[in-house]
């Protein structure tokens, strides 16, 4: 029996194939509008898609430009569609470098080792050098002031003896108290004596020739007399003051 021959001018004249030939065994069909996405997902899984999805720039390149190139079914297209490939990372960095550096400064390329070492040395010298120098200058100034005050106390003393710091402070305290008492006594002392004290005090010829003001001036300018008075804990006062003290003590 002869099989009849059919002549077809083009593929469009062929009879349609039964749908059962294109149906999978598990009866799962792919809609036409999800076909391109399923192919794209399977391709991206080979390229470690979970790493590519972290970069917004790569997602934009793959889902915009590649999608339109791979799945553009146009009868007028004469060139073959290229296969999915990774973009030029160097060109992407060159284009996106300013935006990346502005948004993520930590992702900017590291500085050279020599320049980084120079910056670190400059910052360390700036932060650690100035406070130490200022502190040293303040300590030196305080020590100088303390030394000047101690020398002033030593000059105030009526004697010239080498003493340590503790002895200098103790003796200066005693001598300052003596000076305060002596000043209070001289402030209320009469300038001229109103009593004849030749028989009671036992004045010598030298004392008789001097006035009260001259005698006080001699005592003030004599380191020996001040040393004796301060060491005994007494001060100079007049005869009038002595009589006043006796009168006050009797009335008490």
UniProtKB/Swiss-Prot annotation:
GO MF term list: DNA binding; DNA-binding transcription factor activity; protein dimerization activity
Gene3D superfamilies associated with the record: Helix-loop-helix DNA-binding domain
Domain bHLH, chain residue ranges per copy: 130-179
Leader sequence residues: none
Location in the cell: Nucleus
Superkingdom field: Eukaryota
Record key words, sorted: DNA-binding, Nucleus, Transcription, Transcription regulation
Biased composition (Low complexity): 121-134
Cellular component annotations (GO), alphabetically ordered: nucleus
Subunit annotation: Homodimer.
PANTHER family attached to this UniProt entry: BHLH DOMAIN-CONTAINING PROTEIN, TRANSCRIPTION FACTOR HEC3-RELATED
Name of the featured protein: Transcription factor bHLH117
Gene name of the encoded protein: BHLH117
């Amino acid at each position: 029996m002869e099989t009849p021959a059919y002549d077809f001018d083009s593929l469009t004249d062929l009879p349609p194939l039964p749908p059962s030939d294109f149906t999978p065994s598990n009866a799962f069909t792919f809609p036409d509008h999800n076909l391109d996405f399923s192919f794209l997902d399977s391709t991206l899984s080979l390229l470690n898609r979970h790493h590519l999805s972290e970069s917004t720039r790569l997602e934009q390149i793959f889902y915009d430009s590649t999608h339109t190139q791979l799945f553009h079914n146009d009868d007028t297209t004469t060139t073959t569609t290229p296969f999915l490939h990774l973009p030029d990372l160097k060109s992407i960095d060159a284009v996106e470098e300013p935006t990346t550096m502005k948004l993520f400064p930590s992702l900017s390329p590291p500085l050279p080792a020599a320049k980084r070492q120079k910056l670190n040395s400059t910052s360390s010298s700036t932060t650690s050098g100035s406070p130490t120098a200022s502190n040293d200058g303040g300590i030196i100034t305080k020590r100088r002031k303390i030394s000047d005050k101690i020398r002033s106390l030593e000059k105030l003393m009526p004697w010239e003896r080498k003493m340590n710091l503790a002895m200098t402070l103790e003796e200066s305290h005693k001598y300052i108290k003596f000076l305060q008492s002596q000043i209070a006594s001289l402030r209320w002392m009469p300038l001229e004596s109103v009593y004849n004290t030749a028989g009671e005090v036992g004045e010598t010829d030298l004392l008789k020739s001097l006035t009260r003001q001259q005698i006080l001036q001699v005592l003030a300018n004599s380191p020996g007399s001040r040393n004796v008075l301060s060491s005994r804990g007494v001060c100079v006062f007049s005869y009038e003051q002595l009589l006043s003290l006796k009168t006050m003590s009797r009335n008490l």
